[in-house]
Amino acid sequence: MMGGNISHEFMLLTPVGEDSIAICTECDYRANMEAAECLIHNEKNADTQELVLVHTPNIHTIEDVCEFLHCEKKTSCKAVVYQRNSDDHYIVLFIRGDLEVNETKLTNYLGYDIHPAIITEESGLHAGYIGPVNLRGDFTVLYDRSLEGMNNLSCGANVCEYHYTGLDMRRDIEGAEYHDFAKIQEGGICPHCGKPAITVSRGIEVGNIFQLGTKYTKSMNMTYIDANGEAQYPVMGCYGIGIGRLAASICEAHHDDYGPIWPLAVAPWQVHLCAVRADDTKVQEYADKLYEELQNKGVEVIYDDRRVRAGVMFSDADLIGVPFRVIVSPRNIKQNIVEIVSRDKSLSVNVSMASAAEEILKTLSAAK
C-alpha cells in the first residue's frame, strides 16, 4: 500500500496475470492475496498429551518431521525466520505447518522491511529445530492465529536433532498474542460468508484507489485553515489507471491464435486497407482513391500497399488486429467489388467499388 489502511484494486482475471486473487464462489468477496484475511477454524483435541522431547536425527524440514513423527502438517508448529533490513534483527514467526506466511501482512504489522533470515551460529537459533518452548534470545517472536488454542502439536525443541510432541499452546506458551500472518489457500474459509469456498485466480491490476488519509500531509506538516480558523491536515486520495496495463488486458481478453482483436472503441485504426498486388496500376489507383475518400470522411485507416504476397499482408494484418479489413485486389477489381472482413471473422461481405466508402461507414456505425 502507498499509505493508509484502505485500498481498492481493479483487476482483470486472466491466467497470465501477475497477481493472485482470492475469490469466493459463494458470495461477492474478492481480495488480492496480499491482503486477503485467512480465517482458521482451530480444532483442539479433547485429550491433551504431555510435552515429550523426541530425538529426531538429521530431520530439518517440516515434511521430514511429519514423516518421522507420523503426523500431519496441520498438527505441527513450524518456525519461519526473517531479519530486519536495517540491522538484521531476527523475527521468528510460528505458524501451523500446512500454511504459508503472507510476507505483506507481516511487513505491514511490523512497520519495517524484512528479508528471509540467514541463520548463523552466533544467533542462538538452530535451523530446522526452532520452537516456541524455551526459545531464548533477543528475537521478535510472533504467532499466527492458526495456532491459537491448539494442542498436541509437534515443534522444534531449540536443540539440534530434537523436537517436541504434545505442545499445548495455552499450557506451554505464556503471554502469546496471535495475529493473521497466513496466506489464504484454495478451499479456505471466506471472511465474508464463512463458507470454505475460496478459489485462487491470477489477475492483472488495471487500476487502483488508495485512501491515503493524512499520512503524508502530517509527515510534511501540510495544513489549511478551516472555516473556524483552525489548522487542519488535508485528506488525500490516490487514483491510478494503468494505461499500458489496460492495453495488455484488452489484448488478453480479445485475441485469437493469430494476434489481438481490438474492440472498435480502443483500436488504433478502424480500417486496415490492404492493396493486394499494388504493382497493378488499377489496384493502386483505386486503393489510393478509397484511402483518401475514407480519410476525408473521418475514418482512421492504416494503408498497406507493400509489394508483398497476400498471405504475408493478411498475416501482418492479423498481428495488428484492426477491427475491419478492406481488401482491394486484381480479382476484386475485375468483379467490381471490394471485400470487407472483420478481424473476429464474424463478417465477410463483398460490396460494390462505387459504394465501398459508404458501405464501410455503415459497417463501422453498426459495430459501435
Model features per residue range: what roles?
Residues 1-368:
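NTP/phosphate- and nucleic-acid-binding module
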